[in-house]
Amino acid sequence: QYGAPGTEFKVYADGVYVSDKPMGPFTYQKHNPMSYKPGGFVQGAGHGGTFEDAYGNYWHVATCMLSLKYKFERRIGLYPTAFDKDGVMYSNTAFGDYPLLTPKGKVDDIANTFSGWMLLSYGKPVMASSMDSTLVPENVTDESMRTFWSARSGEPGEWLQISLEGLKEVRAIQLNYYEHRAVQHN
């Protein structure tokens, strides 16, 4: 595996070289990149590594672009990974922003790790007790990791409310915590 260049961009990737010998020569895998995520809440999926879990399933851990406090600021993404019938390694990053099912055994098809739970809050009405400058409540439902809401004070009693505009079955809640005004690391 290799981390492709492009850290300065919002989208970058990981690829694979293959060989029959540990010291090479190496050739470019038939399909690359093996990990790439150009859109959605999280973008990037590069400069990572792959591991095998206790059941024999493969997972790719990769960095995802944030770049708000510093140009190389990142978060970590986790994507199911497999090898096709020709031995070509690939990762499924399509629903990397959504909850995955934790395998309780060997997974035959990595698409089966997708929970099917879809985003209910996108673009829905939001109300809040207050806001800090331009960090409006609507940022909470815009499906961007790079925007966020902040209450004016951060004191007890601040709140945020999202209307799902009807009765919905909620299977999970995802909170993206951002270190707004954090000073412990300059």
PLM feature spans:
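Hydrophobic core segments of beta-strands in well-ordered, beta-rich domains
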Residues: 1-6, 57-66, 176
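Short, solvent-exposed loop/turn segments at conserved positions within beta-propeller repeat blades
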Residues: 7-12, 71-74
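Non-cytosolic beta-sandwich-type ligand-binding/adhesion modules
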Residues: 11-19, 168, 172, 176-186
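Beta-propeller blade signature
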Residues: 13-22, 76-84
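Blade-edge beta-strand/turn elements of extracellular beta-propeller
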Residues: 17-40, 86, 90-94
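Residue-level detector of Asp-centered blade-edge/turn motifs that repeat once per structural unit
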Residues: 52-55
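Beta-propeller fold recognition
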Residues: 68-118, 123
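Disordered, acidic Ser/Thr/Pro-rich linker "stalks" and the adjacent N-terminal cap
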Residues: 101-167, 178-185
